[in-house]
Amino acid sequence: HETDSDGQVMNSMIEALTELQEMIVNLRYAFLTVHKARSFGSGSERLYVSNKEIKTFEPLKEICEEAGGHIPSPQLENQNKAFANVLERHNKAAYLVVGDSANFTNWAAGQPNEADGTCVKADTHGFWHSASCDEKLLVVCEFYFIL
């Protein structure tokens, strides 16, 4: 665009940029409000969501990644509780991932027991059990936002 002598094109671009900046601020505020409300309700910054499907471990991993999430990996007691609330609501167990250097664990009595399998599942009370990766369990994905 050629600028006229009064700089009207430049002024209109500055106005448009200012409007866009205001929209971004408003969208960020709306997003953070919804995120905080969901976190307040669950007690966790992480969000655990089920699509109600039943899958083995590998398809679950793909489903969660395609949705922009991950297989649940609770790092704190409140995260595990939020995860367990989803399982209790659906009355089903689900897979989770436990890191090698996990600071938080919630193994059930007698667990882990690799004879039961190399994957890990959580029951409706949030206790963790060794499991076969071929077991069909509730699909639950974990989402979290870092801003």
Curated annotation (Swiss-Prot):
Domain C-type lectin residue range list: 62-143
CC per GO annotation: extracellular region
SUPFAM superfamilies: C-type lectin-like
Keywords: Calcium, Disulfide bond, Glycoprotein, Lectin, Phospholipase A2 inhibitor, Secreted
Chief location category: secreted
A Pfam family this chain is assigned to: Lectin_C
Carbohydrate-modified residues: 103
Subcellular location: Secreted
Protein name (Swiss-Prot/TrEMBL): Phospholipase A2 inhibitor subunit B
GO molecular function ontology, one term from the record: phospholipase A2 inhibitor activity
Assembly behavior: Homo- or heterotrimer; homotrimer of PLI-A chains, two PLI-A and one PLI-B chains, one PLI-A and two PLI-B chains, and homotrimer of PLI-B chains (with a ratio of 1:3:3:1).
Family listed: Belongs to the alpha-type phospholipase A2 inhibitor family.
Function: PLI binds directly phospholipase A2 in the presence or absence of calcium. Inhibitory activity of the PLI-B homotrimer is less specific than that of the PLI-A homotrimer.
Expressing tissues: Expressed by the liver.
Record-annotated disulphide pairs: 64-141, 119-133
InterPro entries: C-type_lectin-like, C-type_lectin-like/link_sf, C-type_lectin_CS, CTDL_fold
